Amino acid sequence: MPMTPPIRPNQFIIRVALAFCLLLTPALGFGQDPGGVHMVRPDGEGERYWPRWRGPSGQGIVTDKGYPDTWSDTTNVLWKTSVPGRGHSSPIIWGDKIFLTTSRNRGRQVSILSFSRSDGRLLWDVDAPAGQAEYVHNKNSPAAATATTDGERVYASFGSRGMLAVDLAGNLIWHRDLGRIDNYHGPAGSPLLYRDNIIIYQDQNGGAFVTALNAGTGQTRWRTERQASVGWGTPIAITVGDHDELIVSSQRLVQSYNPITGDELWQCDGMLREVIPTPVVGHGLVFCASGRAGPTLAIRPGGRGDVTGTHLEWKTTRGSPFVPSPVIYGDYLYQVNDMSSIVTCLNAKTGETVWQERLGRPRREGISASPVIVDDKLFVTNDDGETFVLRTGPNFELLHINDIGARTLASPALVDGVWYIRTEQELIAIGIS
């Protein structure tokens, strides 16, 4: 079976140049935003790979070309490999290594795995220190959170089992017990690497918090208590003019913190009780989705105190997702309502519905993976492993449907023309054969 193309040195130069150009492109929903608001991106070589949840953009947007847009369980498959255990975390990639988390023995054993990008071989398998497993929803897993890496260490969160850092050879660097999670669905939010800090929040029944840990040692840099009782999202770091903000979208409130000190900057009311999607940014706004029936909020960051009456640009319940995160591209915000298998295209500036269509047969909670944008196309994968490929823009156009033939809850990773897709039992590399 064909192998993944080798990584060539000149690809780094091309990717850095491309990323720089994209940062200067104000018309798109990524890079340097025309409103002076943009996602804090990885340093150095992090732009070249897929080092975190939703990739270097943090928003599920792929900027380079050469990826196939058609596949099946046999077509354009470069390799397949079995993944031990169970988990819904997405792959992350650095250099020639892929990293995943997994759970075995009914959650009593949680691990970080490393695979070879070239052929899918399992390189190493490292367990987190022993601990008590918490309750998780039957669609969740103790290995739901996607790891992150800075090219020196891989950082993974396992809920009640704590935070783990290993080097790229699989040697344990540090482990932190962050307390037991009690939020009735189990862990899910992924850690965020910001400068030399690992930031994560855990909203639960008593003792909710957001914290920053020293990436090198695991020691606490700061910790801020929170009031939310449930929440499963991933924080984002954004640049707003001359300063950075840490955005936490959770139960009832969207809150902004100083990522250096943990001090709250502002809060905006209007979210529902259950919040899973990761916020995205574009056009000077932060877009936050909540709950099984919305709403989605568009907030102008940079305020202070309660900004509900001053910085909430628009609010809608049209097409809001429960699990999948939205994606913004150009002038449009795309959301996938997994409660009814409906994709909605909104005008990002106004919140008005541009189009709304159903993808396949309606199924309650039938889509878990977050959508990605590749080559001006929107890719939406349902739990059955069907990927709907749509043209981006103001008109709905379904190009085709790819069926990988396996249950798929994890979001993909994309590097050097290859899709890396985690199914329920396998890791699959999809490229142009």
Predicted regions and their residues:
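Noncatalytic, solvent-exposed loop/strand surfaces
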Residues: 29-433
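N-terminal secretory signal peptides that target proteins for export/translocation
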Residues: 1-13
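Bacterial N-terminal signal peptides
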Residues: 15-27
